[in-house]
Swiss-Prot record:
Record keywords: GTPase activation, Phosphoprotein
Organism phylogeny: Eukaryota, Viridiplantae, Streptophyta, Embryophyta, Tracheophyta
Site (Arginine finger): K177
One BP annotation, GO: signal transduction
Phosphoserine modified-residue sites: S59
Protein name per the record: Uncharacterized Rho GTPase-activating protein At5g61530
Annotated organism of origin: Arabidopsis thaliana (Mouse-ear cress)
Length: 376
C-alpha cells in the first residue's frame, strides 16, 4: 500500500513539473513576441518623428529662402538696429545735457562764491582802517552828517528813504510794522556803506525801505533822544511845553533828524485808513529805535547784519564789530531770504511809546522852531 501511494505522488509531481515547464516556455515565447512588437513599433515611431521634424525644418528653410521672406527678415533686423542706435544716441545726448547743466551750476556757484569773497575782502580792508570813511550804518549820526557836507543836518539815507516812501509807499499796509526781506536789505546796507549818496532802486517794496530806515536808526551808537535826556524827555510826555523845552537840549543834528522822522510818521498816520498804521501803531514800532536806555538797546536789529552771539556782550561791542561779525554766512542760521524781526515785544518801553506818539500827534506844536520839512 505505501509503495502504491508513493508511485502516484511521483507521477503527479512529474506531470506538474512537465506542464509547468511547458507553460513557462509558452510564456517566454509570448513575452518575446510582445517585446519584439513593441520595439518594432517604437522604431517605427522614432523614424516617423524624425521624418516629420526634417520635413518641418525643410519647410521653414524653404520659406526663409523665399525673396519676400528674406526681405522681411532683413527689414526687421534693420529696424531693430535703428531702434537700438536711437536709444544709444538718446542716452549719449541726455548724458551730455546733464554734464552741461552740472557745469553751468558749478560756474554759477563759483561766481557767487567769488562775489561773496570780494565783498568780505572789501569789508576787511575797510575795517582794518577803523570805520570806513563811507560807512553810514553803525556810525555816530554827527559823523555821518559831517562827511556828507550837506547844508541839511539830516543823514542822506533817511532823506532818500523818506522821499521814496512819500512818493510810492504811504498807502502800503503795515508800513514800519511788516517785516522786511533780509537779503535785499543787506544789499541796500552794503550799497549805502559804499556810497551814502546812492539812490534806492525803482521797484523796491516800500516795506523794505521802511525797514531799512528803521534799521539805520537802530544801528546808531546812541538814540536820537540820547541817554542823558532819556528820563527828562520821558517825564515831559504829558506836556507839550515841557517836551518842547526838553528837546531843545538836543544837538542840532539829533533835533532836526528827530523832527524829520516824526514828520514822516505823521504823514504815514494820515493815511491810516489805507495803511492800517495810526499814531499809536507807529509809536509801538518806532519807539524802540528812537528812544532807549543804555541797558535796553534794540538788540533784535543786530542779528541780521551780524551773527548772534552765543554769550552776553557788552553794550559797546556794536561799535567794535569786525567784518566777520557784520557779514552773516548764508550757509548758517536762517535762510538769507527770511524776514527780519523788527520788534521785541517782551522789552517794550511803554513810556518811550507814549513819547513818540506825542511827537507824532503834536508834531507841529512841539517843533515850532525847526525848519519845515518839505518833501520833494
Amino acid at each position: 500500500m505505501p509503495s502504491l501511494i508513493s508511485q502516484q505522488w511521483q507521477e503527479r509531481t512529474s506531470g506538474f513539473f512537465s506542464s509547468s515547464g511547458t507553460k513557462l516556455r509558452e510564456a517566454g515565447q509570448t513575452a518575446g513576441s510582445f517585446v519584439g512588437e513593441v520595439a518594432k513599433d517604437a522604431k517605427v515611431n522614432v523614424a516617423d518623428v524624425a521624418e516629420r521634424v526634417g520635413s518641418l525644418f525643410k519647410s521653414r528653410w524653404a520659406i526663409l529662402q523665399q525673396p519676400a521672406t528674406r526681405h522681411a527678415v532683413q527689414e526687421h533686423l534693420i529696424t531693430a538696429a535703428a531702434t537700438t542706435g536711437t536709444f544709444v544716441r538718446k542716452g549719449i545726448t541726455e548724458t551730455k545735457e546733464k554734464v552741461s547743466v552740472g557745469k553751468i551750476k558749478v560756474e554759477e556757484a563759483a561766481k557767487k562764491t567769488a562775489q561773496k569773497s570780494k565783498t568780505i575782502l572789501t569789508d576787511i580792508e575797510r575795517w582794518q582802517k577803523g570805520v570806513a570813511s563811507s560807512d553810514v550804518f553803525g556810525v555816530a549820526i554827527e559823523i555821518t552828517v559831517q562827511r556828507q557836507e550837506s547844508s541839511r543836518p539830516i543823514p542822506l539815507i533817511l532823506v532818500k528813504c523818506a522821499d521814496y516812501l512819500i512818493l510810492t509807499g504811504l498807502n502800503s499796509p503795515n508800513l514800519f510794522k511788516a517785516e522786511g526781506d533780509r537779503k535785499l536789505i543787506q544789499q541796500l546796507v552794503s550799497a549805502y556803506n559804499q556810497d551814502p549818496r546812492a539812490s534806492i532802486p525803482e521797484g523796491v517794496n516800500p516795506v523794505d525801505v521802511a525797514a531799512l530806515l528803521k534799521y539805520y536808526l537802530a544801528s546808531l551808537p546812541t538814540p536820537l533822544t540820547t541817554f542823558e535826556l532819556y528820563n527828562e524827555i520821558k517825564d515831559a510826555r504829558s506836556s507839550i511845553h515841557r517836551m518842547r523845552q526838553s528837546l531843545q537840549k538836543l544837538s542840532n543834528v539829533n533835533y532836526n533828524t528827530l523832527e524829520f522822522i516824526t514828520a514822516l510818521l505823521l504823514r504815514v498816520s494820515q493815511k491810516s485808513l489805507l495803511n492800517k498804521m495810526d499814531s499809536h501803531s507807529l509809536a509801538m514800532e518806532m519807539a524802540p529805535v528812537i528812544m532807549w536806555r543804555e541797558d535796553n538797546r534794540p538788540e533784535s536789529y543786530r542779528e541780521y547784519w551780524r551773527r548772534p552771539s552765543r554769550s552776553p556782550k557788552k553794550s559797546n561791542d556794536f561799535e567794535t564789530a569786525t567784518p566777520w561779525d557784520l557779514l552773516s554766512d548764508e550757509g548758517e542760521g536762517p535762510d538769507a531770504s527770511s524776514s527780519i524781526p523788527l520788534d521785541d515785544i517782551a522789552r517794550v518801553d511803554f513810556g518811550a511809546v507814549e513819547v513818540v506818539q506825542c511827537l507824532i500827534e503834536h508834531h507841529n506844536a512841539i517843533f515850532t522852531d525847526a525848519a519845515e520839512t518839505v518833501w520833494r
